[in-house]
Amino acid sequence: MFNIVTRFQYAANQALTSSIIIAGIVIVSSLLQLYSNNAWSLGTTSISNIKPQVSLKHSFNYGSVNRKPKENSRIQFDLETDLSPLFNWNTKQLFVYLTAEYPGKSDGSSNKITYWDKIITSKEDAVLSLKNQKSKYSVWDIEPSFRQRDAVVKLEWNLQPHIGPLIFGETDEIADFKFAEYVDKKKEQK
């Protein structure tokens, strides 16, 4: 330790090593607290009253090509859940999203779409009670029609901590519905 550069290097190495050790302790203790709170088995979720709706859209923004109409799907649903066990002192925010998974065109393939999402930033807002909630997004399939396919709905989440890796999970509760067929209301009125 005879010159200023050596002293600075020693102090910087000590600070960096200490910071990494403290960050590791924070990450491990945060994960242990989530495990002790049973955060991965949230048993208080209820997804119900799913009402699918299908409409035709002519816009490129809704999957239309060459102005040919494209079926777009939306849903209306009820959701009851308590996500507060996912919050601790290291939780920055929780990204919650409602997905539907349905069979694809080829055997063994499946498609997954997101109808609704929300960012929750505090434990007080982590209890959701939604009635007749409309989906946030209108979705379309690569195929021309949803053709009365069955879909399984799940509530999934992404926990974003202040320090540490992103943590993905889903609730145990699932619900299912059959995509509605498009009915041309103008033709029905004639």
Swiss-Prot record:
Q: What is the lineage of its organism?
A: Eukaryota, Fungi, Dikarya, Ascomycota, Saccharomycotina
Keyword annotations for this protein, in alphabetical order, are: Endoplasmic reticulum, Membrane, Signal-anchor, Transmembrane, Transmembrane helix
Annotated InterPro entries: SPC3 (IPR007653)
- Biological process GO terms, please? protein targeting to ER; signal peptide processing
> Entry's Pfam families?
SPC22 (PF04573)
Per the UniProt topology annotation, the Cytoplasmic ranges are 1-9
Transmembrane feature ranges: 10-32
State where it is primarily located. endoplasmic reticulum
Put simply, this protein is called Signal peptidase complex subunit 3
Residue numbers on the Lumenal membrane side: 33-190
List cellular component terms (GO): signal peptidase complex
Assembly and binders: Component of the signal peptidase complex (SPC) composed of a catalytic subunit SEC11 and three accessory subunits SPC1, SPC2 and SPC3. The complex induces a local thinning of the ER membrane which is used to measure the length of the signal peptide (SP) h-region of protein substrates. This ensures the selectivity of the complex towards h-regions shorter than 18-20 amino acids. SPC associates with the translocon complex.
Functionally, this protein is described as follows: Essential component of the signal peptidase complex (SPC) which catalyzes the cleavage of N-terminal signal sequences from nascent proteins as they are translocated into the lumen of the endoplasmic reticulum. Essential for the SPC catalytic activity, possibly by stabilizing and positioning the active center of the complex close to the lumenal surface. Essential for viability.
Q: Which gene encodes it?
A: SPC3
Answer whether the UniProt record assigns the keyword Protein biosynthesis to this protein.
no
Query: Where located?
Result: Endoplasmic reticulum membrane
Q: Does the keyword rRNA-binding apply?
A: no
Tell me what topology the record assigns in the membrane. Single-pass type II membrane protein
Entry similarity comment: Belongs to the SPCS3 family.
